[in-house]
Amino acid sequence: MINFKQFLEEERKNPKSKTLHAFDMDEVLFHHDHSKVKVHVKDQHGKKVQSLTNQEYNSHKLPHGHSYDYSEFRSSKVFKKSATPIHKMIHKLKAIHKNNKNVEIVTARSDMDDKHGFMKTLKHHGIDPHEVHVRRAGNTGAASPAEAKHKVIGDLVKKHGYKRVHLYDDSKDNLEKFKSLKHDHPDVEFHAHHVEYHPETGHVKLTTTKA
């Protein structure tokens, strides 16, 4: 027997479709003022030694004995202040969802400190979190964002039997790791869409590769 949360999750899906579209959140659906939100690196004494933007964090290698401070990335208030919608990508998400309900947001973030405040901000920008599930890959405890998303999407493929999976992400590392799922699922098509957003012009460039 499934619980109520699982029931709501299944209601979002189209069981007839074997295609999943997964969207990264930061720098794909929302651009951020990097002066307002960063991941901080602390040394073994708890002293802040470095601050990373979302894009820098994606490829950062944590030195031995150091740790990450995600407090700004877990703050719903900071998200509301720093996030600017990338309208072309949000429109794309909504258009795909209209025809195929199997659309999810897969973010490297973990749980936000104010779930309802975060959901309210998403809805304000046209994304209904009751319709589009937000997978928080940061909760997996994986060593990197790429490995975390690899695990989350791999689990979804196993659970729902998807035959075509699309990932829209601004990190090439994340996309390369995503395509490596082909080794475990040779009968599945993996479409990696690299998203480059230029805030000065509002231009979005998509580059697609396939595994």
Model-assigned labels for residue ranges:
Residues 2-11, 207:
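Proteolytic processing junctions in secreted/extracellular precursors
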Residues 15-143:
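Alpha-helical substrate-recognition element adjacent to the catalytic core
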Residues 19, 101, 131-132, 163-165, ...:
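Residue-level recognition of the N-termini of beta-strands and the immediately preceding loop/turn
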Residues 19, 149-172, 178:
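Conserved Lys-Pro-Asp/Glu-containing loop-to-beta segment of HAD-superfamily phosphomonoesterases
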Residues 88, 113, 117-120, 148, ...:
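Extracytoplasmic/secreted proteins, especially bacterial periplasmic and envelope-associated proteins
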Residues 98, 119-128, 155-159, 179-188:
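Short, surface-exposed basic-aromatic patches at helix termini and helix-loop junctions that form
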Residues 142-157, 204-211:
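Short, surface-exposed amphipathic charged segments that create phosphate/polyanion-binding patches used
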Residues 164-166, 172-211:
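Asp-based, Mg2+/Mn2+-dependent phosphohydrolase catalytic module
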